[in-house]
A protein has these predicted regions:
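Acidic-basic catalytic patches of nuclease active cores, encompassing PD-(D/E)XK
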Residues: 1-29
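Residue-level signal for inorganic ion chemistry
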Residues: 19, 76, 95
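Secondary-structure boundary/capping motif
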Residues: 24, 29-30, 49-52, 114-118
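Short acidic/glycine-enriched loop/turn segments that link adjacent beta-strands
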Residues: 33-36
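Conserved catalytic cores of phosphodiester-cleaving nucleases, focusing on short active-site segments
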Residues: 38-61, 76
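Mg2+/Mn2+-dependent nuclease catalytic core
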Residues: 57-81
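Domain-level recognition of nuclease-like catalytic cores that cleave nucleotide substrates
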Residues: 86-121
Length: 121
């Protein structure tokens, strides 16, 4: 497993813990199908939340959210549709992005976490 995959797994675990502290329930992590992958799927009161986690060393070059372009959003929507066809729910779907800025991609320096709810609007 490469370094970026390890860092990505660390970022997703950190994001899941962040969501739990905000009283979300994690339903799935690393859901994948032939259309793509969704980092986290969680519930928040009336929403089934599909979460894209972006881990960066800093926001100096570009904000992590800028890496979730229209093409990536479309891929996430299609993947979420597949998940919903396999796991029907009465909850409203929502797409969130969690940006994590960690200078060394570890817990040695406290990372900055930003949560954008309904990020694709």
């Amino acid at each position: 497993m490469g370094k970026s995959k390890l860092s990505g797994a660390w970022g997703e675990a950190l994001a899941a813990e962040f969501l739990r502290k905000k009283h979300y329930s994690i339903v799935a992590a690393g859901y994948s199908c032939r259309f793509g992958e969704i980092d986290l799927i969680a519930t928040d009161r009336k929403y089934l939340v599909f979460v894209e986690v972006k881990l960066r060393k800093s926001a100096n070059f570009a904000k992590a959210m800028e890496y979730v372009d229209r093409r990536k959003q479309d891929k996430l929507r299609i993947t979420a549709s597949m998940y919903l066809s396999q796991n029907p729910t009465k909850l409203q779907p929502r797409f969130d992005v969690i940006e994590i800025y960690a200078p060394d991609a570890t817990a040695t320096i406290h990372p900055e976490i930003r949560h954008m709810e309904d990020a694709f609007q």
